[in-house]
Amino acid sequence: MRPIDRQIYRPPDFRTTFLQTADTKDKTKLSTGAAEHTPLMKQFFAAKSDYPDLLLFFRMGDFYELFYDDARKAARLLDITLTQRGSSGGAPIPMAGVPVHAYEGYLARLVALGESVAICEQIGDPALAKGLVERKVVRIVTPGTVTDEALLDERRDTLLMAISRSKQGYGLAWADLAGGRFLVNEVDSVDALEAEIARLEPAELLVPDEDNWPEFLRGRVGVRRRPPWLFDADSGRRQLLAFFKLHDLSGFGIDDKPCATAAAGALLGYVEETQKQRLPHLTSIAMEVASEAISMNAATRRHLELDTRVDGDTRNTLLGVLDSTVTPMGGRLLRRWLHRPLRLREVLVQRHHAVGSLIDTGADTDVREAFRALGDLERILTRVALRSARPRDFSTLRDGLALLPKVRTILAPLDSPRLQTLYAELGEHDATAHLLISAVAEQPPLKFSDGGVIATGYDADLDELRRLSTNADQFLIDLEQRERASSGIATLKVGYNRVHGYYIEISKGQAEKAPLHYSRRQTLTNAERYITEELKSFEDKVLSARERSLSREKLLYEGLLDALGGELEGLKRCASALSELDVLAGFAERAQALDWSQPELESAPCLHIERGRHPVVEAVRDQPFEPNDLDLHPDRRMLVITGPNMGGKSTYMRQNALIVLLAHIGSYVPASRAVIGPIDRILTRIGAGDDLARGQSTFMVEMAETSYILHHATPQSLVLMDEIGRGTSTYDGLALADAVARHLAHTNRCYTLFATHYFELTALADASHAGGGSGIANVHLDAVEHGERLVFMHAVKDGPANRSFGLQVAALAGLPKAAVQQARRRLAELEQRGGDSHAAEMAPAALDAPQQFGLFTAPSSAAQEALQALDPDELTPKQALEALYRLKALL
């Protein structure tokens, strides 16, 4: 296997060293660095040469040190001190370091920033080494391959993804090493590829080192370019067969998926290369079927704010309202479900029935209460498989398995088919639970090296060795009393430190009374320390017992790992069942707490929602939420929604999309009733800003997202369109909005919620009725003026709006009174000159005719406009004089 990167590493300061020592006689030796660098630096360069693009944590005693460019980079990223460590090769050595006992925190920060780190450990014992202690890279930590608890977000999957491409499209493979999942997929377009990456959000992405990759991948954190030959379908197939010890891949359903196979092989090769060990927890590979899930592109996920708001905040999102899971593994499963709503009606009906059964029996409360003592078994089992489990992983697993009889008792009487399946998948693990109960201490230490991991009574030999250590305390007390009595020194003490071992301490003033058989061991400022033959013999015996005790514990620990390894598959199924049960119980809790109802999934096309609410807006608002209905069917496929800004148009559209999504993950929904027919896609075009990274304006982003919708929407798609055409001129925007609405209604024939400020579009409904049917109807949200206040009703009513209340909203936003007054005057002038442009007076065909609307005919002069903009009551004398000069200049 080749190293991670292909280039050969050269010490970064070689060229500088050569230039700075021009008077050196043998410049050839300097150019290679072999003759001038210290032995330690040679060892560093040898380790670094295999990992030139990774930060190298180089173990030196109690610190991991970084040198040269690594030190500079780490100092900048971690805000640690950049210093120097002498010189080597004729130049100072830049150095930065982190303490070994706290390195995981620094490592987590680097991984979160997309960095990869090679850990170079001291292999030999420094006390026994002659010359340099041996060092070796024993571990590579990359953003997509971490499995340590301290480096992971407990409620989010950490994924490694590989992408291959062919003439037919793209192959994707991704693995959750911390959870033991390995999946593949194939997509046929760049848009579909972007949608999958947006759904999965991989921490690290492997791609062939080639040109012409999609623009959205450029500059993305965590992208690793790899040699193209690693993404070969044939070699990938051989690698998968060897890894899983199989003769063919038909059991995984990927025999006819060469592009996905190529990606999977590249991913597996990278994992084996970086982890430097077997991966027994990856026992299969699954093929995702795109047709089984509702499709949502990146824009839709962003607009609906599933787990992250448009501004990047993770609060007040759908996941924030919905997530009532108790365990981290349940939280991760819920996030996966939320980002991949299913179209499989039977699966969803079973989930809904399970939630209902938990509610009706009150079992959800019992399950959630039991789960409060349940840890993250999924990730613990991964660490068991990788033999990196820590002492408290064993105790957490023990306590989790001890809960199983209680959970099984709760589920046994329930009549839900899905809950009974989960009951069976929990399995019976009494023997494993008993093993851990008898073998693991009640409260084990954090680190294995502290000892005390194995319970007393589990192993007789270990108990005997511990007794030697335990009895040592009493021996030392007795020895101290005897020595005080025999020497006559009342202040004599017996103690121990790690450097000098056991000792007898006598103060300087009493040192002359020390018996002749005392041998001086250490001299302090105020005391002398001694050793006796008896104490030396005891020391050898006790220290030997402690070393042997730790060795015995390690042997027993390895035996526990072996025993658990044989039960791994059943335990993984159990953890998976517990995760799903946690999610379903959370759904039940949310349904009761938030007054949600069970949706009805129909095979006939329809979308009927009664008294629907927006789950997030309702949760964060103090006042009651105004519920609204939605009724779409083959003869009523599009609603043109008009009304004032802030009136609730966007909220109404989003809430219906979220209700559909919630129904398709198995949750109850915020409505009194929801009847939902087949849905294959949710597509949205809601709000936008400039995409500066791609050099796209607001209008360009709007048109790109609209184009995607027009090309992909089907009669089973739900489409939300908000204010199409507002990013350009009035006429262009109106023409585009009209064309898009007609295309969606006549060509795509999808379910569409179309919010607009162009009242002219409300005439489309009249044309629909007159022409016999493109299924367009008008609805509106209204507001009422109460004195100087504007009260938004938030109720959706049939028919078009008669006012937009734009000026009133502007006043609410705090526009200067003069600007609002000028706007009112200008509006009156435009309405007088252009006539009433209400849609009821405008023929639908007008949009097809090559004419202007007369909106801005006979423009006023610049001087008139400037004069109308002035508010004399708000001008100072100086401002009034300046305004007069400006007006004169315009004449």
From Swiss-Prot:
One of its GO terms (biological process) is mismatch repair. The keyword Membrane does not apply. Disulfide bonds: none annotated. The keyword Nucleus does not apply. Keywords: ATP-binding, DNA damage, DNA repair, DNA-binding, Nucleotide-binding. ATP binds at residues 643-650. This is DNA mismatch repair protein MutS.
